[in-house]
């Protein structure tokens, strides 16, 4: 990977919020959730960009759906989730849905590029 290309990405920032353990009001809870949602949207948009790059790079349409890679991603996510204290009951279905939607997006991008 080109180090200079990697440094061109702006650092992800999350708006100021109260730590969940310190929240005393529902307004504080909602502000925290909203701040995290805005950050997640930015991350998901960037992830989508990588799916578009994959569609451009992959040599054939069959390469878009890679069952082995899906299971590798889920395993890595679950390991990271456990370290972060995120429940498997949230992490696994969220990522499986995310992967499914990203693959659908990648197929559409692949077809559009080769139209």
Tell what function each PLM region has.
Residues 1-115:
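Domain-level signature for soluble enzymes in the chorismate/prephenate branch of the shikimate pathway
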């Amino acid at each position: 990977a080109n180090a200079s290309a990697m440094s061109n990405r702006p650092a992800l920032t999350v708006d100021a919020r109260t730590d969940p353990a310190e929240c005393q009001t529902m307004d504080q809870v909602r502000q925290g959730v909203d701040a995290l949602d805005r950050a997640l949207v930015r991350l998901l948009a960037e992830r989508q960009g990588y799916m578009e790059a994959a569609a451009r790079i992959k040599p054939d349409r069959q390469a878009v759906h890679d069952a082995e890679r899906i299971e590798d991603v889920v395993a890595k996510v679950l390991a990271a989730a456990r370290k972060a204290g995120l429940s498997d009951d949230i992490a696994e279905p969220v990522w499986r849905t995310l992967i499914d939607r990203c693959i659908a997006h990648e197929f559409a991008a692949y077809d559009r590029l080769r139209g």
